[in-house]
């Protein structure tokens, strides 16, 4: 486990110390690499996103993401637990400290899978798609109420827990703050949304868009859940716009004129009736779902439903409950965007000295008024209708001081006399962990009674009211049993389940090791591995010492072959002497062929039994050899011993008594036997069958090993005499 952890640390540069274990790569976020790990302090699996800070631009994006995700708190948004520095160090609330780091780690809630992986298995049932779409709109309503644009909505950024069918929006790496009371034209980044989920307005004006771009992406995702494939999958921006115009009607004339000035080839006089309407692209869906989708996928963002309006659509009536669809109580404003600029360039510090416009040259009717404020109380920004949008002319929004809550925005928490920086634990043995407040019965003071991480805003309220939605009631039989089984587990706090994740990991590793041992034990002969090993050995270069030994061995074989020829000539001379002795014994045994044995005084033996014994000894001798070379050198030693012994008649007889009718190769010389036992008609004419048998069994026809000299049976015949 330690080696695996260190290898991942070295490859991907994760430096979190020993607190986190069992790192597993999950993917890449909008601006960082994401891993899952188990927190040893609380025995909980979390997702960790690493953001590398290489230049001022990356620091700006990291600051923006951290600022947004720390303030967002919703049941359909992935929760963030901690922001860590290198080696798992805790970061201070000082904004400038972020510029001194080379990387930061965002520890957030771990989700089981994402919508992209689910859709790889095929389309969803319409009821499941409606449930997920409701949760997506519910999260978007909260995000947009906080004046935040996600700008990267796609199935891969929508995370799901399959056990309870909860969907959460994640990866705010490309999100940004957009105060609706100020114009952002010309100051928005281009090409952030994934191409397949870009709205027509974003394709025409990449740096001028509103919250409606998130709603277009949500509509494309809903259609993808119903069909299992991307609704508009263009290879480039021009093809993407072409696919949209084939299915989405262009109602307003000003939109058609704008298209005519950009892509006149694809523009017709009447574009209210598309060639391939959504009814053809989405066959089989209900009429209510089609009407719901047509009101979201509109060409003009002004005609498009907002998240709040979409939740009120009749198609969502089975889930919609406005009291259970909260909005942000502390939305972002223009000064939060200015903080990013101040951090990146200290030369803009004079922006703090902006003055209000006391006298406005525009009338009150020229300005859109927010519904929550009286027209007399709202400070009008003359820049909103101006073509000049320099950052230095940005008007600070005075609405933040209208309700008299000036202490909310004090830059130093010490100015608040009612605020205590000391942690107020409910219990003396309380542990300060960032995750336990989600599952344990007591709070860990996370996001409560503490100043904001980056913007130094001190909330007046002592406690943040976390909103918890009731469980969505839906009759989905596929998940009923699983919910019942896990009800007991959810009743326990995470602290009581401490050690469960580690024990599960250890059990998985033990089972994998056991399975590997079983495979090794039951593994048979692998022909492919044998061939691969043989090819590998044959391709290797042989050492010089081995080649020299092989050459010496070949020369030894040649010398033995020469000696065998000499031994063969000696054996032929002995054979001629044995033939002469056979002539004297023709009359001794007239019917020896019919008898079962040959008698020679006290020394008598069965011929067949003798042959079998000799063959068994030969086989036993060969079985004792461990290799071909052992057998070869054993034969060589036997040959040398035979050549050193003198060949005399007396000793030859003794040797014949021991070896009988067998030569050194264990073969029986039948032609000598036929002559010695005096078979009738043996001396018949040459054409007789026995003579032909004798001709086929002559010593020249009987092949034996060249390393072993032939033997004759003269000693045996002498013994019989």
From Swiss-Prot:
Motif extent (FRIEDE motif): 332-337
Tree of life domain: Eukaryota
Short sequence motif SEG motif: positions: 189-191
Location in or out of the cell: Cytoplasm; Nucleus
CDD domains: STKc_MAPK4_6 (cd07854)
Activity modulation: Activated by phosphorylation at Ser-189.
GO BP: intracellular signal transduction; positive regulation of dendritic spine development; protein phosphorylation; signal transduction
Cofactors required: Mg(2+)
Domain Protein kinase: 20-316
GO molecular function, one term: protein serine kinase activity
One CC-aspect GO term: septin cytoskeleton
Region of interest: Disordered: 701-721
Entry's free-text remark on domains: In contrast to classical MAPKs, the TXY motif within the activation loop is replaced by the SEG motif, whose phosphorylation activates the MAP kinases.
This protein's name: Mitogen-activated protein kinase 6
């Amino acid at each position: 486990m330690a080696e695996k952890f260190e290898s991942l640390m070295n490859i991907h540069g994760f430096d979190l110390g020993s607190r986190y274990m069992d790192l597993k790569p999950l993917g890449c976020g909008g601006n960082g690499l994401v891993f899952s790990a188990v927190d040893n302090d609380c025995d909980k699996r979390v997702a960790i996103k690493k953001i590398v800070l290489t230049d001022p631009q990356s620091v700006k994006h990291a600051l923006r993401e951290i600022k947004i995700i720390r303030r967002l708190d919703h049941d359909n948004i992935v929760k963030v637990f901690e922001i860590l520095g290198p080696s798992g160090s805790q970061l201070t609330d000082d904004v400038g400290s972020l510029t001194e780091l080379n990387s930061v780690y965002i520890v957030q809630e771990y989700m089981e899978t994402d919508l992209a992986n689910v859709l790889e298995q095929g389309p969803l049932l319409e009821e499941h798609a409606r449930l997920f779409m409701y949760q997506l709109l519910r999260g978007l309503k909260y995000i947009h109420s906080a004046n935040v644009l996600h700008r990267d909505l796609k199935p891969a950024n929508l995370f799901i827990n399959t056990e309870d069918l909860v969907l959460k929006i994640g990866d705010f790496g490309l999100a940004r703050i957009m105060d609706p009371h100020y114009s952002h034209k010309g100051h928005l980044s281009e090409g952030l949304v994934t191409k397949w989920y870009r709205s027509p307005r974003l394709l025409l004006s990449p740096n001028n868009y509103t919250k409606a771009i998130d709603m277009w992406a949500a509509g494309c995702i809903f259609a993808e859940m119903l069909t299992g494939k991307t609704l508009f999958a263009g290879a480039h921006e021009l093809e993407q716009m072409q696919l949209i115009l084939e299915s989405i009607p262009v109602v307003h004339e000003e939109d058609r004129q704008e298209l005519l000035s950009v892509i006149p080839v694809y523009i017709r006089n009447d574009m209210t009736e598309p060639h391939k309407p959504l009814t053809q692209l989405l066959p089989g869906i209900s009429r209510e779902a089609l009407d719901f989708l047509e009101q979201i996928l509109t060409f003009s963002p002004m005609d498009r439903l907002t998240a709040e309006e979409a939740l009120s659509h009749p198609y969502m009536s089975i889930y919609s409950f406005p009291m259970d669809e909260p909005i942000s109580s502390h939305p972002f404003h223009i000064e939060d965007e200015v903080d990013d600029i101040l951090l990146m360039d200290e030369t803009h510090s004079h922006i703090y000295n902006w003055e209000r416009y006391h006298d406005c040259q525009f009338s009150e009717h020229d300005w859109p008024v927010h519904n929550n404020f009286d027209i007399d109380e709202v400070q009008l920004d003359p820049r909103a209708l101006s073509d000049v949008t320099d950052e230095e002319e940005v008007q600070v929004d005075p609405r933040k001081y209208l309700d008299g809550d000036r202490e909310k925005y004090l830059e130093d928490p010490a100015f608040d006399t009612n605020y205590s920086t000391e942690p107020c634990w409910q219990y003396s043995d309380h542990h300060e962990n960032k995750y336990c407040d989600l599952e344990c019965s007591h709070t860990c003071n996370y996001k409560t009674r503490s100043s904001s991480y980056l913007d130094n805003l001190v909330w007046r309220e002592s406690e943040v009211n976390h909103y918890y939605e009731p469980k969505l009631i839906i009759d989905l039989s596929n998940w009923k049993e699983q919910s019942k089984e896990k009800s007991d587990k959810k009743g326990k706090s995470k602290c009581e389940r401490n050690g469960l994740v580690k024990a599960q990991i250890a059990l998985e590793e033990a089972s994998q090791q056991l399975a590997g041992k079983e495979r090794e034990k039951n593994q048979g002969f692998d022909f492919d591995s044998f061939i691969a090993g043989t090819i590998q050995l044959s391709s290797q270069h042989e050492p010089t010492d081995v080649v020299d030994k092989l050459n010496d061995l070949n020369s030894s074989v040649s010398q033995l072959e020469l000696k065998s020829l000499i031994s063969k000539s000696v054996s032929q001379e002995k054979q001629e002497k044995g033939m002469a002795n056979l002539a004297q014994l023709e009359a001794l045994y007239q019917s020896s062929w019919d008898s079962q044995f040959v008698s020679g005084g006290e020394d008598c033996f069965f011929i067949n039994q003798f042959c079998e014994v000799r063959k068994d000894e030969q086989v036993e001798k060969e079985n004792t050899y461990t290799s071909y070379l052992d057998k070869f050198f054993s034969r060589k030693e036997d040959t040398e011993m035979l050549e050193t012994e003198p060949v005399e008649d007396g000793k030859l007889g003794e040797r014949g008594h021991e070896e009988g009718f067998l030569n050194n190769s264990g073969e029986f010389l039948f032609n000598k036997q036929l002559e010695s036992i005096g078979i009738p008609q043996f001396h018949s004419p040459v054409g007789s069958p026995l003579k032909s048998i004798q001709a086929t069994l002559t010593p020249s026809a009987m092949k034996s090993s060249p390393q072993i000299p032939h033997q004759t049976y003269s000693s045996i015949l002498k013994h019989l005499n």
